[in-house]
Amino acid sequence: MKKTYSMELAGRTLSVDVGRVAAQANGAALMHYGDTVVLSTATASEKPREGIDFFPLSVEFEEKMYSVGKIPGGFNKREGKASENAVLTARVIDRPMRPLFPKDYRNDVTLNNMVMSVDPECRPELLAMLGSAIATSISDIPFCGPCATTQIGMVNGEFVVNPSQADWDNGDLQLTVASTSEKVIMIEAGANEIKEEKMIEAIYKAHEINQTIIAFINNMVAEIGKEKHAYTSCAVPEEMFAAMREIVTPAEMEEAVFTDVKQVREENIRAITEKLEEAFACLLYTSPSPRDRTRSRMPSSA
């Protein structure tokens, strides 16, 4: 089902096309802001990755030469490796979104943002941040969002919301604020000796704008959002943590870790690890794996 949603954002129209492209992705949004166009997709594997104790999230921001009307010249016509800006943009997308996924979720998730057209007045980095949140929110991937991102610049002492590339590069402030409906969850900033009061004012301003974007995303989720899929929980049972605390007390752990000598600290941790492995060795072969438990719904909050 093809649908288009739009809202006014900093004097321009933000438009989101859903259902036009990337139909096989769990969630996809074709973002338009001015003449800048970014395709954001969210995909997840069907099964959790085994043997890991972290959430395998991958974020990509792909800058294409054709988006600015150029074709690579010379013998090699292929695109080069990701630029420093692309890597840093992917990290800024990752930081606010990663904590909003369930802690016991181990399915591989990829957020891909492909820049298709660039308008110097509308930075594609912002569209990628918003597009990733929208694509994930409307998908069936468990996610405790939505979240929204706003960038604030400062030119001649005045705030500029979602500034152009020139104002972003030459202004006195480069502030990126990501928020949920409840609080600010990420701040990244660079400034040219502005007052602390001005910085706080800019953060509050960005957070206020984020609330309008979140309301916009929630409206999309209510209309076209998919039901979040069931997944295999990879959380360690609380009973196991309690048993571990009986074998190694918090005081023992603090004494082992809080030492200035790295070699001593590593030896202490190795000894504690061996002690726990020996205590739980029999359970590894006689008890069912905690990963056999299945969660039917995602948590209600992050």
Q: Language-model segments: which ranges?
A:
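Glycine-rich, flexible beta-strand/loop modules in the N-terminal catalytic cores of phosphate-handling
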Residues: 25-110, 115-117, 122, 188
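Hydrophobic alpha-helical segments, chiefly the membrane-spanning helices
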Residues: 296-302
